[in-house]
From Swiss-Prot:
Forms a cylinder of 14 subunits composed of two heptameric rings stacked back-to-back. Interacts with the co-chaperonin GroES. This is Chaperonin GroEL. The lineage of its organism: Bacteria, Pseudomonadati, Chlorobiota, Chlorobiia, Chlorobiales. The gene is groEL. Keywords: ATP-binding, Chaperone, Cytoplasm, Isomerase, Nucleotide-binding. It comes from Chlorobaculum tepidum (strain ATCC 49652 / DSM 12025 / NBRC 103806 / TLS). GO terms for molecular function: ATP binding; ATP-dependent protein folding chaperone; isomerase activity; unfolded protein binding.
Length: 545
């Protein structure tokens, strides 16, 4: 077992604080509209320029192991806030540093750390309740655009694009972010359900210019097994041909005689038909086929359920207003399924998302949810250089997360003002002794820190003066660091998602409390590796034999 170094008491806490400060000081320069960029060296490729707190935090590893532990604890604040709310990572870091700094002064002066922690916890609970109280819900496109703009570091183009995407695919819809080939940033919306399977044969193409198979007012046959024998497919094919409507066949695979017969009939013009493989694998494939069936009002022909392909009737077939198939994707628009069944399926998937413990499963469930609830929007991010592209893409992803958070829990006034207004809730926090009262006051002081830092980053205004002016005002009145004016910030579009502000405070207080109640720090002893012994002189030892 490796030997360990142990630091106790003030020595441990002082070193932890150095680590906390190093990371927090690098992160907090990015806060607010006047925040600066941080340049990060990459061993391969160009350096990365970012104004995203969590990206900076994740890059920091310190040489001293105890200092590094302090830094990593605060990095956890940023990461957790990013995971939960998608934004607010810099605010969370600034709050954690302030709570730890103020708490440490009191611990050094003789306060009991555990009582400070209790006071901090009670204070945070009341501030969060007050934040929820002053929160307001958002619904309009304009409000969504404001949240997106602020979270994308005051880029109105990104805010407008996100609002447009949410407008098109709904609040539960999937919005993905991709790199564009050119310099333009644009929004592309795939309406209806799209899955990543193309036609099984190019002979199914109906539009030779676009190389797509287009089926209008189509019928859809959904089967969960391979189809290779034409005999079992023939009865339902004849019924579909009599209806005069085009037919899409979705199955695990279609091969041999069955595929050849479909192609020949398509080329002769006796049957408008196309065939694709079923999306997904294993249990996910079964679930996705069921989704398609519910969306189109059809039935999955599955022997597990007692259905046989040769006995299939027209009642088993789904229907859609339009189906477009290219070599890679199939898109079903306006499925004719019953709305109540689709809603029930959506609620079932939402329930599975809540219970899911795997990020991968959650992502796949959310994709299925989006396909059922209105489509997929793709934000294609364009830029003139790779460095700019990466930075812009990261900002768009942040803004997207923050906007979703705003839709979930509403918004509060931005610019650090919401935390100052929420300090009103501290009047309800009950302290059992003086140290707990001190814990409450630590939070009161820490709540001012984000505003102080936003002002400090402007480099032109005195933070103490701004703070006093904002504290003496009421409601949404605050300091707009972009214009350096005092105004109604909500009207000016300076807003933060409630979930972001709440998560930042809760996570900061949690980690700062752990650091305050730390009495010892244990690290591995660094081993000095001995120099390699010198090589013997040239030639083979011992001479020749």
């Amino acid at each position: 077992m490796t030997a360990k170094d142990i630091l106790f008491d003030a020595e441990a806490r002082t070193k932890l604080k150095v680590g906390v400060d190093k990371l927090a000081n690098a992160v907090k320069v990015t806060l607010g509209p006047a925040g600066r960029n941080v340049l990060i060296d990459k061993k391969f490729g160009a350096p990365t320029s970012t104004k995203d707190g969590v990206t900076v935090a994740k890059e920091i590893e310190l040489v001293d192991p105890v200092e590094n532990m302090g830094a990593q604890m605060v990095r956890e604040v940023a990461s957790k806030t990013s995971d939960v709310a998608g934004d607010g990572t810099t605010t969370a870091t600034v709050l954690a540093q302030a709570i730890y700094r103020e708490g440490l002064k009191n611990v050094t002066a003789g306060a009991r750390p555990i009582d400070l922690k209790r006071g901090i916890d009670r204070a945070v609970k009341e501030v969060v309740a007050e934040l929820r109280n002053i929160s307001r819900s958002i619904s309009g496109k304009k409000e969504i655009a404001q949240v997106g703009t602020i979270s994308a570091n005051n880029d109105p183009e990104i805010g407008e694009l996100i609002a447009e995407a949410m407008d098109k695919v709904g609040k539960d819809g999937v919005i993905t972010v991709e790199e564009a080939k050119g310099m333009e940033t644009e929004l592309k919306v795939v309406e209806g359900m799209q899955f990543d399977r193309g036609y099984l044969s190019p002979y199914f193409v109906t539009n030779s210019e676009t190389m797509e198979a287009e089926l209008d007012e189509a019928l859809i046959l959904i089967h969960d097994k391979k189809i290779s024998n034409m005999k079992e497919l023939l009865p339902i094919l004849e019924k579909a041909a009599q209806s005069g409507r085009p037919l899409l066949i979705i199955a695990e695979d279609i091969e041999g005689e069955a595929l050849a017969t479909l192609v020949v009939n398509k080329l002769r013009g006796t049957l408008k038909v196309a065939a694709v493989k079923a999306p997904g694998f294993g249990d996910r494939r079964k679930a996705m086929l069921e989704d398609i069936a519910i969306l189109t009002g059809g039935t999955v022909i599955s022997e597990e359920k007692g259905y046989k392909l040769e006995n299939a009737t027209m009642a088993y077939l789904g229907q859609a207003a339009r189906i477009t198939i290219d070599k890679d994707n199939t898109t079903i628009v306006e499925g004719k399924g019953k709305q109540e069944e689709i809603k029930a399926r959506i609620n079932e998937i939402k329930g599975q998302i809540e219970k899911s413990t795997s990020d991968y499963d959650t992502e796949k469930l959310q994709e299925r949810l989006a396909k059922l609830s209105g489509g997929v929007a793709v934000l294609k991010i364009g830029a003139s250089t790779e460095v700019e592209m990466k930075e812009k893409k990261a900002r768009v992803e942040d803004a997207l997360h923050a906007t979703r958070a705003a839709v979930q829990e509403g918004i509060v006034v931005g610019g650090g003002v919401a935390l100052i207004r929420a300090a009103k809730g501290l009047a309800k926090a009950v302290a059992d002794n003086e140290d707990q009262k001190t814990g409450i006051e630590i939070i009161r002081r820490a709540l001012e820190e984000p505003l102080r830092q936003i002002v400090a980053n402007t480099g032109t205004t005195d933070g103490a003066v701004v703070l006093e002016k904002v504290k003496n005002a009421e409601g949404d009145y605050g300091f707009n660091a972009r214009t350096e004016q005092y105004e109604n910030l909500i009207e000016a579009g300076v807003v933060d998602p409630t979930k972001v502000t709440r998560s930042a405070l809760e996570n900061a207080a949690s980690v700062a409390s752990i650091l305050l109640t730390t009495e010892a720090a244990i690290t591995d002893v660094k081993e000095d590796k001995a120099d390699m012994p010198a090589m013997p002189p040239g030639g083979m030892g011992g001479g020749m034999y």
